[in-house]
Every structure is written in structure tokens, then in C-alpha cells.
């Protein structure tokens, strides 16, 4: 079930007697969806994915939910440690093997702005595309973390030891405060290798919000006088560039639209 709105605005803010014009087009859309039901025999239907990160359809859920593993945490709400990460006795992070919803690929809204300037046969236009909301799993970031080449593995040019704000389970089954120090390498090895080939999925879920300069184009249209001695009635020459500049992204240089192993562009 889909519900949404789409708004479009076309305007010409500037038009001069010399022939200069500025045309502006703004397109805004917002959509929400809900899966009403699946066949009774199916509770989870895979739409794509790889290893321990999958795109599942579930009754009552949204189309395009990202499912994967998450950090193991204290789930007992009556515990004073509720919500804290559970580590090994050596202080290493651990992950739950059961997949849960860790993200949703669907954006909250989309916005496109096209601006076109024209003067005496010349026209210059650019398109800015914006996507707000939604998440994406980045296998690229996970691979860089595993090899130690990601910026997150060497904050401010240093790899200091760390003690996670977490608890571990002692021999009596009770939670104890973690005081064990681990190296940066040990931390990322645990995060990227636990629970499957893609590691703890939650660790590499990023906001898919992005703003980009989608297109730049420059064109020249020959007027009829120039073509009067030719068999052509109209000629327009131009150059165009796509995906020119990622203005804003949360994915450390990875394009949120670059997708592998999912049939839903998640």
C-alpha cells in the first residue's frame, strides 16, 4: 500500500528585453508504504541481499527494510545495565546471530531543482538532486575497516587502545563492568568478522541522505538564419556531465546509489 504526494513548480524569475531568461523547476515527492500481508506460509520474504545482510518484506513492515545482525546488548529492561553492549571477558564486541531490522532504504522525501539560463541561442542548466532519510548498508566501508584502511580505524592519525563502555557475563551469569583494554585492530577485526562475512551489520548502516549536483549541461542552438543555406531546420550542439559533485553524503566517499547484490536498489 502506497500513499504519497508529488509537487512540481515551474517559474521564470527573470526575463529581460535583451533575451536573457532564467527558468526554474522544483520537484518534491514524498511516499510511504506498508506491506499489508504475505502468504500465510511466509513470515519473511527475501527481496535480495548478500550473506548476513538481507532486504526482507514482512507483513506490517515497509517495503525495502534492511535486516542484519546487531551488537549484542543487555535486553533486560529491569537491569541497571540495560542497553549496554555485551563484550567477551577479553573486552571484544560481540554480535547477535539473529537478524533484525537495522535500517530502511526508503527515503522520507526527494527534492529536485533544475535551473536553466538562456541567452541568444546559448543555454546552461544544472540539476541538484536531494534525498532525505533512509539508510544503506556499506560493504565497502566494512571491507576497508577489515583491512585497516578506513578513516574510522585511524582517528586523527592514531590507533590508541580502547576500553569499551560495556559489560561482560561472568561465570555466574551476572553482568560485570568491562575494564579490559583492546587494540583498535582487535576491535575492528571483531566487528567485521563476527556473525557472518559482512560482520555486525549494524556497524555499517549509514544514512542515505545526500545532496548531489546531478547534471551540468551547456548547449547552443543555431538560429534559422545560420541554417538558411543548409538542409537542416534545427541544430543544437551541447555537452553534458552527470554525477558531477557529491555535495553532501554520510558514506565516506561511497555513492549511496552504488548498489551490489540487491534487486531492490537497497
Could you tell me what each predicted segment is?
Residues 133-236, 241:
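Extracytoplasmic gating/loop element in the C-terminal half of outer-membrane beta-barrel translocons
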Residues 1-5, 12-105, 136, 143-146, ...:
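Conserved small-residue
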Residues 9-17, 22-24, 32, 119-121, ...:
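Outer-membrane beta-barrel proteins
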Residues 7-11, 113-119, 126, 216-222, ...:
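Residues on the lipid-exposed face of transmembrane beta-strands in outer-membrane beta-barrel proteins
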Residues 2-6, 21, 108-112, 210-217, ...:
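Transmembrane beta-barrel architecture of outer-membrane proteins
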Residues 104-139:
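Glycine-rich, aromatic-lined ligand/substrate-binding cores of catalytic
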Residues 246, 250-266:
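Predominantly the C-terminal beta-signal and adjacent terminal strand-loop region
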Residues 86-97, 186-202, 259-265:
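Flexible, solvent-exposed coil segments and beta strand-coil junctions
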Amino acid at each position: 500500500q502506497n500513499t504519497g504526494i508529488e509537487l512540481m513548480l515551474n517559474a521564470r524569475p527573470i526575463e529581460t528585453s535583451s533575451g536573457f531568461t532564467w527558468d526554474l523547476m522544483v520537484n518534491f515527492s514524498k511516499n510511504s508504504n506498508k506491506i499489508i500481508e504475505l502468504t500465510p506460509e511466509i513470515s519473511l520474504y527475501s527481496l535480495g541481499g548478500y550473506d548476513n545482510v538481507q532486504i526482507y518484506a514482512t507483513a506490517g513492515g515497509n517495503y525495502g527494510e534492511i535486516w542484519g545482525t546487531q551488537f549484542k546488548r543487555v535486553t533486560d529492561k529491569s537491569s541497571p545495565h540495560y542497553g549496554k553492549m555485551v563484550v567477551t571477558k577479553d573486552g571484544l564486541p560481540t554480535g547477535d546471530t539473529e537478524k533484525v531490522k537495522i535500517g530502511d532504504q526508503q527515503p522520507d522525501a526527494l527534492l529536485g531543482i533544475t535551473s536553466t539560463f538562456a541567452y541568444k541561442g546559448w543555454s546552461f542548466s544544472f540539476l541538484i538532486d536531494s534525498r532525505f532519510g533512509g539508510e544503506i548498508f556499506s560493504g565497502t566501508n566494512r571491507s576497508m575497516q577489515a583491512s585497516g584502511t578506513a578513516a574510522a580505524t585511524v582517528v586523527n592519525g592514531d590507533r590508541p587502545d580502547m576500553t569499551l563502555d560495556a559489560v561482560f557475563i561472568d561465570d555466574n551469569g551476572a553482568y560485570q563492568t568491562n575494564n579490559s583494554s583492546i587494540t583498535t585492530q582487535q576491535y575492528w577485526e571483531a566487528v567485521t568478522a563476527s556473525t557472518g562475512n559482512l560482520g555486525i551489520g549494524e556497524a555499517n548502516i549509514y544514512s542515505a541522505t545526500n545532496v548531489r549536483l546531478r547534471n551540468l549541461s551547456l548547449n547552443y542552438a543555431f538560429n534559422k538564419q545560420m541554417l538558411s543555406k543548409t538542409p537542416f531546420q534545427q541544430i543544437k550542439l551541447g555537452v553534458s556531465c552527470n554525477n558531477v559533485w557529491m555535495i553532501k553524503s554520510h558514506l565516506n566517499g561511497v555513492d549511496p546509489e552504488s548498489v551490489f547484490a540487491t534487486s531492490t536498489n537497497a
